[in-house]
Regions:
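The feature marks helicase ATPase cores and/or their adjacent C-terminal helical subdomains
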Residues: 1-632
Length: 632
């Protein structure tokens, strides 16, 4: 590690990036930008220099520099820093993909026809092999019918619609997944589409590239390979990949003509935390960061607690008390702001259990393609309840009839122009809407807590809101279907089974889930706090609460043997649960700006302690047992 340096160590990186972004001789690059490296500052600095150097030329040729961000917040921040300059097209990945394809209606129709026909064929093959008359069979036939209905509407669509930040449930709407898949397919298979992209955007920069959809990243790599007059710049860090649909090992095995600049400084974390995350990372790729020379030492403590304790909240409060004593920072305990200490969990299962919506969460998390949408709140079936039903019921409970009217008028198909035309008087539509709202609200009479399935069926009957595709099959079931007994074979549709389980939970779970993903709770995860930083962090490691097969702190800390699946993955070079867990541990620890407390609940205290010391992650003095805590 470098020992003699100053805080200007990374200044040369901006010059390297600017050299790559030369319109006359463009080069592609992967910028390694680790935790707190000042990546956004570098990005903005380089873009401002590009504007000074090439702004007039780009404007004259009607070209732009495209910047793809991961979140809306990051997008807004960069736009603000660039003072809304039209030279730059800053957008999220979904917005960018939609802008690429939105005008190619005929091509989109062809893609949808091919995809829908393929899906119908697959379902019909499954139906031919399955047992007739079961609930699975009835549901599958409805899925086939719904897909055929969508096929039949394609010819009537003159223009497709898509909202990157909302729900896409109209007949002419594309889903988030479809927009990404279509744009990637067009880039890979249509040379004209590639040409249009690079003519419009001679420079394309991707922030948080390790978490950007891998199919689109792969397509962009193909475009760059075939078009050397195009600069593709990726900003990221493979150790910070937290979503499963990001490209693995991005930044390694790059083409020989790619540049690989690296930012070494960590401007965020105190020196002790930087040392810790370097040690955690050492067995992954060995990349190390350097703390700022003017950073304080900071504090790190590791609390090892037996898993069978039954008072975890009290223990964690005692840990905060101990951290206040160790650090001399009373904000660990004496703060009117409950978020003064950010509690970060391994993953959402832990927070879901602690907040009381684990049955809702666990049922949907089983389905791999649902996970990302569940983690960020964008899953259409979930948004149906959080964005339509929840605001409506809250407004009704508060007696805010104006808000009720606004929600219904904006979101109900009853107020679509084509529906209003079917009625002689608009008052008839209003009466129907009021009846539907009152019928829905009646489910909460006497302070009842209705099941999600009852809410879904009520809305499906009244047609107050459009039912998302993922819930249509269930909403279309009749009373006759409810008595059909399904078989116990593997013929069951996992997505419908997951929703059946989720819909059996109560509306209270939706409220708690929404509070969590809206950051209205004290809990956060590596996913939910992406890009954020906190003065005081309490990290909770608990495999029992996590319930996840994707991660295991017990394995990482040597308290549990590696599974056969892990061993098999190691042999073929695939990612293991230990590697995933190491990444998440790294991501959580690097959030701390002043002090970090880690509590590990384990079935083998000695093994965890020995691994922590042997790996040089913590010193003996930094490891504290249960008996040193003043538990109240």
């Amino acid at each position: 590690m470098i020992t003699d340096y100053d805080n200007c160590l990374d200044d040369k990186v901006d010059e390297e990036l600017l050299a790559c972004l030369n319109l006359q001789n463009p080069k592609s690059f992967f910028l390694f930008a680790g935790a707190g490296s000042g990546k956004t500052r570098s990005l903005v600095n380089v873009l401002e220099q590009i504007k000074d150097k090439y702004g007039d030329e780009l404007k004259l040729r009607r070209k732009n520099v495209a910047i793809i961000t991961y979140t809306n917040a990051a997008c807004d921040e960069i736009i603000h820093r660039l003072k809304n300059d039209p030279t730059f097209a800053v957008s999220t990945i979904h917005s960018f993909a939609w802008e690429l394809i939105r005008h190619y209606t005929a091509d989109i129709k062809n893609w949808l026809r091919n995809t829908l026909n393929k899906e119908i064929d697959e379902l019909e093959i499954e139906e031919s092999k399955g047992r007739p008359g079961t609930k699975t069979s009835v549901d599958r036939k409805r899925k086939i019918e719904n897909k055929k209905n969508r096929l039949s509407t394609l010819d009537r669509i003159s223009k497709f619609a898509y909202n990157p930040n909302g729900d896409n449930i109209e007949d002419n709407s594309l889903s988030h997944t479809e927009v990404i898949s279509i744009s990637a397919f067009f880039l890979e298979n249509k040379p004209l589409f590639q040409k249009i992209l690079i003519q419009k955007y001679p420079i394309l920069l991707v922030d948080e590239s390790q978490d950007t959809k891998k199919e689109l990243i792969n397509a962009l790599f193909m475009v760059q390979e075939k078009n050397k007059n195009f600069s593709l710049g990726l900003f990221g860090d493979t150790m910070q990949r937290i979503y499963t649909d990001g490209k693995e090992n991005l930044g390694t095995n790059l083409p020989n003509d790619w540049y690989k600049p690296e930012k070494k400084l960590n401007h965020r974390c105190p020196k002790r935390v930087v040392t810790l995350i370097n040690k955690i990372r050492s067995d992954a790729d060995g990349i190390e960061q350097l703390p700022r020379t003017d950073k304080e030492d900071g504090f790190v403590r590791f609390f090892i607690i037996p898993s069978d304790v039954d008072n975890k909240i009290a223990i964690e409060n005692a840990i905060k008390q101990k951290m206040a004593e160790i650090t001399g920072d009373d904000l660990w305990i004496n703060s009117s702001d409950e978020k003064a200490v950010k509690t970060l969990t391994l993953e959402h299962h832990m927070a879901a259990k602690r907040m009381g919506f684990d049955d809702l969460f666990a049922s949907l998390y089983k389905v791999e393609r649902y996970r990302i949408g569940l983690l960020d709140g964008s899953l259409p079936g979930i948004r149906f309840f959080t964005q339509f039903v929840l605001p409506l019921i809250e407004a009704k409970r508060n007696g805010d009839e104006f808000a009720v009217s606004r929600i219904v008028r904006l979101n109900s198909p009853m107020f679509k122009r084509e529906n209003i035309k079917l009625h002689e008087k608009q008052t008839d539509v209003i009466k129907s809407a009021n009846t539907a709202v009152n019928s829905l609200f009646s489910l909460w009479k006497n302070n009842d807590n209705p099941k999600l399935l009852d809410i879904l069926n009520n809305i499906a009957k009244s047609k107050l809101f459009v039912i998302p595709d993922s819930l249509k099959v269930i909403a279309q079931r009749t009373d006759k279907d409810s008595v059909i007994v399904d078989d116990s074979s593997k013929d069951i549709d996992e997505s419908i089974a997951a929703w059946d389980e989720a819909l059996s939970t109560t509306f209270e779970k939706i409220i708690k889930y929404n509070d969590y993903i809206s950051d209205k709770s004290m809990f956060g995860t590596h996913q939910g706090v992406k890009g954020l930083q906190f003065d005081r962090v309490l990290a909770i490691l608990d495999d029992d609460e996590a319930r996840g097969f994707l991660f295991s702190y017990e394995k990482l800390f040597g308290a549990k043997e590696t599974s056969d699946t892990d061993k098999k993955n190691m042999k073929v070079g695939k990612e293991t649960s230990i590697e995933r867990t190491r990444r998440l541990f790294y991501v959580i620890c690097r959030r701390a700006m002043k002090s970090l407390a880690i509590v590990a609940y384990t079935n083998n205290v000695d093994a965890v302690k020995n691994t922590a010391i042997d790996n040089d992650w913590f010193t003996k003095d930094e490891i504290l047992p249960l008996d040193l805590l003043a538990i109240k």
